[in-house]
UniProtKB/Swiss-Prot annotation:
InterPro entries from the UniProt entry: C-CAP_CF_C-like (IPR017901), CAP/MinC_C (IPR016098), CARP_motif (IPR006599), TBCC (IPR027684), TBCC_N_sf (IPR038397), Tubulin-bd_cofactor_C_dom (IPR012945)
CC terms in the record's Gene Ontology section: cytoplasm; microtubule; tubulin folding cofactor complex
UniProt keyword terms in alphabetical order: Chaperone, Cytoplasm, Cytoskeleton, Microtubule
Keyword flag Kinase: no
Name of the protein in question: Tubulin-specific chaperone C
Superkingdom of the organism of origin: Eukaryota
One Pfam family, short name: TBCC
PROSITE patterns assigned to the protein according to its UniProt record, in alphabetical order: C_CAP_COFACTOR_C
Family of the protein in this entry: Belongs to the TBCC family.
Protein localization: Cytoplasm, Cytoskeleton
Length: 259
Protein backbone atom coordinates (compact mmCIF):
# COMPACT_ATOMS: atom_id res chain seq x y z
CA UNK A 1 0.00 0.00 0.00
CA UNK A 2 1.22 3.51 -0.78
CA UNK A 3 3.01 5.00 2.23
CA UNK A 4 2.02 8.49 1.10
CA UNK A 5 -1.65 7.46 0.96
CA UNK A 6 -1.42 6.08 4.51
CA UNK A 7 0.15 9.31 5.77
CA UNK A 8 -2.44 11.43 3.95
CA UNK A 9 -5.23 9.39 5.57
CA UNK A 10 -3.76 9.84 9.07
CA UNK A 11 -3.30 13.57 8.51
CA UNK A 12 -6.84 13.91 7.13
CA UNK A 13 -8.39 12.18 10.16
CA UNK A 14 -6.38 14.37 12.52
CA UNK A 15 -7.48 17.57 10.77
CA UNK A 16 -11.05 16.32 10.44
CA UNK A 17 -11.68 15.86 14.15
CA UNK A 18 -9.23 18.24 15.83
CA UNK A 19 -10.22 21.32 13.83
CA UNK A 20 -13.96 20.80 13.37
CA UNK A 21 -15.71 24.21 13.47
CA UNK A 22 -17.71 25.00 16.58
CA UNK A 23 -21.32 26.17 16.72
CA UNK A 24 -20.08 29.77 17.05
CA UNK A 25 -18.16 29.57 13.75
CA UNK A 26 -19.79 31.53 10.92
CA UNK A 27 -21.48 29.67 8.08
CA UNK A 28 -19.00 31.00 5.50
CA UNK A 29 -16.05 29.78 7.61
CA UNK A 30 -17.69 26.36 7.93
CA UNK A 31 -18.17 26.20 4.16
CA UNK A 32 -14.50 27.13 3.62
CA UNK A 33 -13.40 24.45 6.10
CA UNK A 34 -15.50 21.81 4.34
CA UNK A 35 -14.16 22.85 0.93
CA UNK A 36 -10.57 22.52 2.18
CA UNK A 37 -11.26 19.01 3.51
CA UNK A 38 -12.90 18.07 0.22
CA UNK A 39 -9.78 19.23 -1.65
CA UNK A 40 -7.70 17.05 0.67
CA UNK A 41 -9.81 14.04 -0.31
CA UNK A 42 -9.12 14.99 -3.91
CA UNK A 43 -5.38 14.85 -3.21
CA UNK A 44 -5.78 11.36 -1.76
CA UNK A 45 -7.73 10.31 -4.85
CA UNK A 46 -4.94 11.63 -7.10
CA UNK A 47 -2.35 9.72 -5.08
CA UNK A 48 -4.35 6.51 -5.48
CA UNK A 49 -4.67 7.15 -9.23
CA UNK A 50 -0.91 7.55 -9.56
CA UNK A 51 0.00 4.32 -7.76
CA UNK A 52 -2.94 2.08 -8.66
CA UNK A 53 -0.88 0.16 -11.24
CA UNK A 54 1.91 -0.38 -8.72
CA UNK A 55 -0.09 -1.89 -5.85
CA UNK A 56 -1.87 -5.20 -5.47
CA UNK A 57 -5.62 -5.37 -6.30
CA UNK A 58 -6.42 -6.11 -2.65
CA UNK A 59 -4.50 -3.03 -1.46
CA UNK A 60 -6.24 -0.88 -4.08
CA UNK A 61 -9.62 -2.14 -2.87
CA UNK A 62 -8.69 -1.37 0.74
CA UNK A 63 -7.64 2.15 -0.27
CA UNK A 64 -10.92 2.70 -2.10
CA UNK A 65 -12.90 1.47 0.91
CA UNK A 66 -10.95 3.88 3.10
CA UNK A 67 -11.74 6.74 0.71
CA UNK A 68 -15.42 5.81 0.92
CA UNK A 69 -15.21 5.81 4.72
CA UNK A 70 -13.49 9.21 4.82
CA UNK A 71 -16.02 10.68 2.39
CA UNK A 72 -18.90 9.48 4.53
CA UNK A 73 -17.29 10.88 7.66
CA UNK A 74 -16.93 14.26 5.99
CA UNK A 75 -20.55 14.10 4.80
CA UNK A 76 -21.71 13.36 8.35
CA UNK A 77 -19.75 16.32 9.70
CA UNK A 78 -21.18 18.49 6.90
CA UNK A 79 -24.67 17.41 8.01
CA UNK A 80 -23.85 18.13 11.67
CA UNK A 81 -22.30 21.58 11.27
CA UNK A 82 -24.40 22.80 8.31
CA UNK A 83 -27.86 21.31 8.87
CA UNK A 84 -30.62 22.17 6.46
CA UNK A 85 -32.62 25.20 7.43
CA UNK A 86 -35.88 24.28 9.17
CA UNK A 87 -39.09 24.88 7.25
CA UNK A 88 -40.71 28.20 8.17
CA UNK A 89 -43.53 30.20 6.65
CA UNK A 90 -42.35 33.59 5.43
CA UNK A 91 -45.34 35.36 6.92
CA UNK A 92 -47.69 34.34 9.70
CA UNK A 93 -51.29 33.62 8.84
CA UNK A 94 -53.61 35.15 11.46
CA UNK A 95 -57.31 34.24 11.46
CA UNK A 96 -59.71 35.96 13.84
CA UNK A 97 -61.75 33.64 15.99
CA UNK A 98 -64.99 35.08 14.58
CA UNK A 99 -64.06 34.11 11.05
CA UNK A 100 -64.98 30.80 9.51
CA UNK A 101 -62.02 28.48 8.92
CA UNK A 102 -60.72 28.62 5.38
CA UNK A 103 -59.91 25.30 3.78
CA UNK A 104 -57.15 24.44 1.32
CA UNK A 105 -54.97 27.47 2.03
CA UNK A 106 -51.57 27.18 0.36
CA UNK A 107 -48.73 29.43 1.49
CA UNK A 108 -45.65 29.61 -0.68
CA UNK A 109 -42.83 29.44 1.87
CA UNK A 110 -39.98 29.20 -0.63
CA UNK A 111 -39.59 32.39 -2.65
CA UNK A 112 -37.41 32.30 -5.81
CA UNK A 113 -33.91 33.63 -5.25
CA UNK A 114 -31.37 34.96 -7.74
CA UNK A 115 -28.73 37.23 -6.26
CA UNK A 116 -24.99 37.88 -6.25
CA UNK A 117 -23.01 38.39 -3.05
CA UNK A 118 -19.37 37.97 -1.98
CA UNK A 119 -18.27 36.64 -5.39
CA UNK A 120 -21.02 34.00 -5.24
CA UNK A 121 -24.09 33.54 -7.43
CA UNK A 122 -26.97 32.16 -5.36
CA UNK A 123 -29.91 30.42 -7.03
CA UNK A 124 -32.82 28.80 -5.22
CA UNK A 125 -36.43 27.71 -5.71
CA UNK A 126 -36.51 28.34 -9.46
CA UNK A 127 -38.74 26.77 -12.12
CA UNK A 128 -38.57 27.17 -15.91
CA UNK A 129 -35.82 29.80 -15.69
CA UNK A 130 -32.85 30.54 -17.98
CA UNK A 131 -29.83 31.84 -16.06
CA UNK A 132 -26.65 33.00 -17.81
CA UNK A 133 -23.64 35.28 -17.44
CA UNK A 134 -25.88 38.35 -17.66
CA UNK A 135 -26.77 38.00 -13.96
CA UNK A 136 -23.12 38.39 -12.94
CA UNK A 137 -21.81 41.96 -12.49
CA UNK A 138 -18.24 40.90 -13.34
CA UNK A 139 -16.44 40.57 -16.67
CA UNK A 140 -16.20 37.03 -18.01
CA UNK A 141 -12.53 36.70 -17.10
CA UNK A 142 -13.26 36.69 -13.37
CA UNK A 143 -14.34 33.37 -11.88
CA UNK A 144 -17.30 33.21 -9.49
CA UNK A 145 -18.74 30.63 -7.14
CA UNK A 146 -22.14 29.14 -7.90
CA UNK A 147 -24.44 27.81 -5.19
CA UNK A 148 -27.81 26.51 -6.37
CA UNK A 149 -30.62 24.43 -4.89
CA UNK A 150 -34.23 23.45 -5.55
CA UNK A 151 -34.33 23.93 -9.32
CA UNK A 152 -36.95 22.55 -11.72
CA UNK A 153 -36.79 22.61 -15.52
CA UNK A 154 -34.10 25.32 -15.60
CA UNK A 155 -31.22 26.06 -17.97
CA UNK A 156 -28.12 27.28 -16.13
CA UNK A 157 -25.01 28.34 -18.06
CA UNK A 158 -22.13 30.19 -16.37
CA UNK A 159 -18.88 30.56 -18.33
CA UNK A 160 -16.21 30.96 -15.66
CA UNK A 161 -16.51 29.49 -12.17
CA UNK A 162 -14.16 28.95 -9.26
CA UNK A 163 -16.41 26.26 -7.76
CA UNK A 164 -19.97 24.98 -8.15
CA UNK A 165 -22.32 23.42 -5.61
CA UNK A 166 -25.67 22.08 -6.86
CA UNK A 167 -28.34 20.46 -4.69
CA UNK A 168 -31.81 19.18 -5.50
CA UNK A 169 -32.50 19.72 -9.19
CA UNK A 170 -34.80 17.93 -11.64
CA UNK A 171 -35.09 18.14 -15.43
CA UNK A 172 -32.42 20.84 -15.72
CA UNK A 173 -29.58 21.59 -18.13
CA UNK A 174 -26.30 22.75 -16.58
CA UNK A 175 -23.36 24.11 -18.57
CA UNK A 176 -20.09 25.15 -16.89
CA UNK A 177 -17.30 25.32 -19.52
CA UNK A 178 -14.64 26.31 -16.98
CA UNK A 179 -14.55 25.42 -13.29
CA UNK A 180 -11.15 26.12 -11.76
CA UNK A 181 -11.86 23.98 -8.71
CA UNK A 182 -14.55 21.45 -7.86
CA UNK A 183 -18.18 20.78 -8.67
CA UNK A 184 -20.29 19.04 -6.04
CA UNK A 185 -23.70 17.71 -7.02
CA UNK A 186 -26.29 16.00 -4.84
CA UNK A 187 -29.89 14.94 -5.43
CA UNK A 188 -29.79 15.75 -9.15
CA UNK A 189 -32.25 13.82 -11.31
CA UNK A 190 -33.27 13.56 -14.98
CA UNK A 191 -30.82 16.27 -16.03
CA UNK A 192 -27.97 17.04 -18.43
CA UNK A 193 -24.60 18.36 -17.25
CA UNK A 194 -21.76 19.75 -19.41
CA UNK A 195 -18.71 20.62 -17.36
CA UNK A 196 -14.93 21.01 -17.39
CA UNK A 197 -13.45 21.01 -13.90
CA UNK A 198 -10.61 20.00 -11.62
CA UNK A 199 -12.70 17.79 -9.33
CA UNK A 200 -16.11 16.13 -9.86
CA UNK A 201 -18.25 14.74 -7.02
CA UNK A 202 -21.75 13.31 -7.50
CA UNK A 203 -24.01 12.00 -4.72
CA UNK A 204 -27.55 10.57 -4.50
CA UNK A 205 -28.47 11.24 -8.13
CA UNK A 206 -30.30 9.34 -10.88
CA UNK A 207 -30.67 9.38 -14.66
CA UNK A 208 -28.07 11.94 -15.72
CA UNK A 209 -26.31 12.65 -19.01
CA UNK A 210 -22.86 14.03 -18.19
CA UNK A 211 -20.40 15.46 -20.70
CA UNK A 212 -17.24 15.75 -18.61
CA UNK A 213 -13.63 16.82 -18.70
CA UNK A 214 -11.88 16.41 -15.36
CA UNK A 215 -8.25 16.69 -14.22
CA UNK A 216 -8.71 14.09 -11.45
CA UNK A 217 -10.76 10.93 -11.08
CA UNK A 218 -14.48 11.76 -11.01
CA UNK A 219 -16.26 10.25 -8.00
CA UNK A 220 -19.87 9.10 -7.76
CA UNK A 221 -21.65 7.71 -4.71
CA UNK A 222 -25.18 6.42 -4.12
CA UNK A 223 -26.03 7.24 -7.74
CA UNK A 224 -27.31 5.22 -10.70
CA UNK A 225 -28.23 5.45 -14.39
CA UNK A 226 -25.41 7.91 -15.04
CA UNK A 227 -24.24 8.18 -18.67
CA UNK A 228 -20.84 9.81 -19.15
CA UNK A 229 -19.28 11.23 -22.26
CA UNK A 230 -15.75 11.09 -20.85
CA UNK A 231 -12.34 10.52 -22.43
CA UNK A 232 -9.83 11.71 -19.81
CA UNK A 233 -7.18 9.35 -18.46
CA UNK A 234 -8.36 9.29 -14.84
CA UNK A 235 -10.84 6.46 -14.11
CA UNK A 236 -14.30 7.17 -12.76
CA UNK A 237 -14.58 5.92 -9.17
CA UNK A 238 -17.84 4.60 -7.74
CA UNK A 239 -17.48 4.69 -3.96
CA UNK A 240 -20.51 2.44 -3.51
CA UNK A 241 -19.02 -0.29 -5.71
CA UNK A 242 -15.88 -1.83 -4.22
CA UNK A 243 -15.82 -4.94 -6.41
CA UNK A 244 -13.23 -5.53 -9.10
CA UNK A 245 -15.80 -5.79 -11.93
CA UNK A 246 -17.19 -2.61 -13.53
CA UNK A 247 -19.81 -0.65 -11.66
CA UNK A 248 -23.38 -1.06 -12.99
CA UNK A 249 -24.27 2.42 -11.83
CA UNK A 250 -22.68 4.31 -14.73
CA UNK A 251 -21.62 3.82 -18.32
CA UNK A 252 -19.24 5.65 -20.64
CA UNK A 253 -20.56 6.49 -24.11
CA UNK A 254 -18.30 8.53 -26.36
CA UNK A 255 -21.13 9.56 -28.70
CA UNK A 256 -23.54 10.52 -25.92
CA UNK A 257 -24.04 14.08 -27.20
CA UNK A 258 -23.85 13.42 -30.93
CA UNK A 259 -27.59 12.95 -31.27
Amino acid sequence: MSEKFVELRKEFLTKLYKSTPSEQTSRSEKETWLEEKSKYLGEMTRELNEVQDQIAPYDRRVCMEQLVDLTRRLQQIRHDILPRQPFRFQRALHVKSSQKPVKNITVNAEAPEVYFENDTLYLANLKNQNIGDNVIPYPNNKAVKVSAKSLRSCNISISNCSSVNLHNATKCNFTFPTIQGSIHLSDINDSTICVSCHQFRLHHSTNLRVHLRCKTSPVIEESKEISFSYKDEHPILDFTWARSDPSPHFRITSDLFDA
